[in-house]
Structure formats: structure tokens, C-alpha cells
Amino acid sequence: MQPLQILAIVALVVAAIIAIVVWTIVYIEYRKILRQRKIDRLIDRITERAEDSGNESEGDQEELSALVERGHLAPWDVDDL
């Protein structure tokens, strides 16, 4: 094989690895956004029910606490220092 062909193959492999890493990060961030939207919807439902009935819905609160207490998706992504 000629050096140019070897260089082209190495470049394709490096580009593929970079693409996999980038799309993995995008997928993780997308999951975080979806989870946050679900939490926001639950908070809105709890607020609406509290305004309507005068007390908060315990079912929604339990679901919200289960989502919030699930912990960090990535242990290295801790912002509470």
C-alpha cells in the first residue's frame, strides 16, 4: 500500500471515532433534555392541581420525587461543588 492510501484509511478511522464520540454526547444531552421536560410537566401539573383543589397531588409528587432522586446520569457531571 502506498503511504497516501494508509493516511486516507487512518483519517477515515479517526473521523469515524470522532463522529461516534460526538453523537454519543449529543444523545446523552438529548436524554437529559427529555428528562427535564418531563420534570417540568410534572411540576406544572402539581401547580395546576394545587391551585384548583387547594392541595397538591400526592401521586404527581411521588412521580416527581422518583425522577429527581434517580441521581446523576453521569457521575463525572456534578455541578454542586
Swiss-Prot record:
Residues 53-63 have a biased composition (Acidic residues). One of its GO terms (cellular component) is plasma membrane. InterPro entries: Vpu (IPR008187), Vpu_cyt_dom_sf (IPR009032). The keyword Membrane applies. Residues 50-81 are annotated as: Disordered. It is a single-pass type I membrane protein. It comes from the Viruses. Phosphorylated by host CK2. This phosphorylation is necessary for interaction with human BTRC and degradation of CD4. Keywords: AIDS, Apoptosis, Host membrane, Host-virus interaction, Inhibition of host innate immune response by virus, Inhibition of host tetherin by virus, Ion channel, Ion transport, Membrane, Phosphoprotein, Transmembrane, Transmembrane helix, Transport, Viral immunoevasion. The chain crosses the membrane at residues 8-28. Residues 29-81 are cytoplasmic. Gene3D superfamilies: HIV-1 VPU cytoplasmic domain. GO terms for molecular function: CD4 receptor binding; lipid binding; monoatomic cation channel activity. Residues 1-7 are extracellular. Pfam families: Vpu (PF00558). The modification Phosphoserine is found at S53, S57. Its main location: host cell. One of its GO terms (biological process) is viral release from host cell. HAMAP family: HIV_VPU. Enhances virion budding by targeting host CD4 and Tetherin/BST2 to proteasome degradation. Degradation of CD4 prevents any unwanted premature interactions between viral Env and its host receptor CD4 in the endoplasmic reticulum. Degradation of antiretroviral protein Tetherin/BST2 is important for virion budding, as BST2 tethers new viral particles to the host cell membrane. Mechanistically, Vpu bridges either CD4 or BST2 to BTRC, a substrate recognition subunit of the Skp1/Cullin/F-box protein E3 ubiquitin ligase, induces their ubiquitination and subsequent proteasomal degradation. Belongs to the HIV-1 VPU protein family. The N-terminus and transmembrane domains are required for self-oligomerization and proper virion budding, whereas the cytoplasmic domain is required for CD4 degradation. The cytoplasmic domain is composed of 2 amphipathic alpha helix that form a U-shape. Homopentamer. Interacts with host CD4 and BRTC; these interactions induce proteasomal degradation of CD4. Interacts with host BST2; this interaction leads to the degradation of host BST2. Interacts with host FBXW11. Interacts with host AP1M1; this interaction plays a role in the mistrafficking and subsequent degradation of host BST2. Interacts with host RANBP2; this interaction allows Vpu to down-regulate host BLM sumoylation. HIV-1 lineages are divided in three main groups, M (for Major), O (for Outlier), and N (for New, or Non-M, Non-O). The vast majority of strains found worldwide belong to the group M. Group O seems to be endemic to and largely confined to Cameroon and neighboring countries in West Central Africa, where these viruses represent a small minority of HIV-1 strains. The group N is represented by a limited number of isolates from Cameroonian persons. The group M is further subdivided in 9 clades or subtypes (A to D, F to H, J and K). This is Protein Vpu. The gene is vpu.
